[in-house]
UniProtKB/Swiss-Prot annotation:
Function: Required for efficient splicing and pre-mRNA nuclear retention.
Keywords of this entry: Cytoplasm, mRNA processing, mRNA splicing, Nucleus
GO CC entries: cytoplasm; nucleus; RES complex; spliceosomal complex; U2 snRNP
GO molecular function, one term: mRNA binding
InterPro entries in the cross-refs: Cell_Proc_Reg/RNA_Proc (IPR050923), FHA_dom (IPR000253), SMAD_FHA_dom_sf (IPR008984)
CDD domains: FHA_PML1-like
Subunit structure: Belongs to the pre-mRNA retention and splicing (RES) complex composed of at least BUD13, IST3 and PML1.
Pfam families linked: FHA
Protein's UniProt keywords contain Chloroplast: no
Name used for this protein in its record: Pre-mRNA leakage protein 1
Protein encoded by which gene: PML1
Domain FHA: 104-172
PROSITE patterns: FHA_DOMAIN
């Protein structure tokens, strides 16, 4: 039976890597106040409580561009391009348009349960962007668009996943918004041998 690799709680040593991302941290941290927890309880999908609660300044790219009154030809478009590492010569495995919503949950989607007692049952998928990697978590990370002082910015946040989220081959801290820039590459484990897919954030 397959065993997912897990690290003990709070044992990652980010060291210099953590400092690398300090300039990309946003001032506003996730809301874990009582009111935020109450909102979290009502935030569920398929009966599963979602870890991520959107911030007050969440906005979709489409709504932001509408707010500015921009014509289609003048708008910046956002997408997530996913490649299977061993099949890059075949082109992208999937493309996701990121313009219509303010956030996208990324997580495991295998089509079957990892529990051997539930092999015949269909896996419950809560992710908006599903990745068929057994070592990734159901709620692995989230891509979040925000209106930060009038400027549209996109962030990634690791949702305290089992094996971490890497941005350009560096493990990012959990539960912190890290700004994404066009061409950034995300992988869903800090262990290179676990990563069959690369997620590339693009804006054009």
């Amino acid at each position: 039976m397959f065993h997912r690799r897990k690290r003990p709680y709070n044992t990652r040593n980010y060291g210099h890597d953590d400092k690398k991302f300090k300039s990309q941290y946003i001032d506003i941290m996730p809301d874990f106040s009582p009111s935020g927890l109450l909102e979290l309880e009502s935030n569920n999908k398929e009966g599963i409580a979602l870890k991520h609660v959107e911030p007050q300044d969440a906005i979709s790219p489409d709504n932001y561009m509408d707010m500015l009154g921009l014509e289609a030809r003048d708008r910046t478009m956002y997408e997530l391009v996913i490649y299977r590492k061993n099949d890059k010569d075949k082109g992208p495995w999937k493309r996701y348009d990121l313009n219509g919503r303010s956030c996208y949950l990324v997580g495991r989607e295998l089509g079957h349960s990892l529990d051997t007692d539930l092999d015949d049952r269909t896996e419950i998928v809560v992710a908006d962007i599903g990745i068929p990697e057994e070592t990734s978590s159901k709620q692995h990370c989230v891509i979040q668009f925000r209106n930060v002082r009038g400027i549209l910015k996109c962030y990634v946040m690791d949702l305290d996943s089992s094996n971490g989220t890497c941005l350009n081959n560096v493990v990012i801290p959990g539960a912190r918004y890290i700004e994404l820039r066009s061409g950034d590459v995300l992988t869903l484990s800090e262990f290179e041998e676990d990563n069959d897919y690369e997620l590339i954030f693009m804006n054009v």
